Amino acid sequence: MANSKSAKKRAIQAEKRRQHNASRRSMMRTYMKKTVAAIEAGDKEAATAAFAVVTPILDRMATKGLIHKNKAARHKSRFAAQIKAL
């Protein structure tokens, strides 16, 4: 348990950041699931629209440090390839 005043403050800040990051990560995963669902349904228009929504979200999460930039690039590349194959 935090003993000093500064350690208590840092613990509070860390918990606040953890909750914020969890919310952002959940939002990102939700949009990714929508894209996957559209691809699996074979609906190219819906998949393209979902991809257009999820792309800037992945970029933003990578910029903020929530995910690695290579992970964002990998997801975008795989989504694009799957949509192109429809």
Curated annotation (Swiss-Prot):
GO terms for cellular component: cytosol; small ribosomal subunit. The keyword Chaperone does not apply. GO terms for molecular function: small ribosomal subunit rRNA binding; structural constituent of ribosome. InterPro entries: Ribosomal_bS20, Ribosomal_bS20_sf. One of its GO terms (biological process) is translation. Keywords: Ribonucleoprotein, Ribosomal protein, RNA-binding, rRNA-binding. Transmembrane segments: none annotated. Residues 1-28 are annotated as: Disordered. Residues 1-27 have a biased composition (Basic residues). Coiled coil: none annotated. Binds directly to 16S ribosomal RNA. HAMAP family: Ribosomal_bS20. Belongs to the bacterial ribosomal protein bS20 family. This is Small ribosomal subunit protein bS20. It comes from Vibrio parahaemolyticus serotype O3:K6 (strain RIMD 2210633).
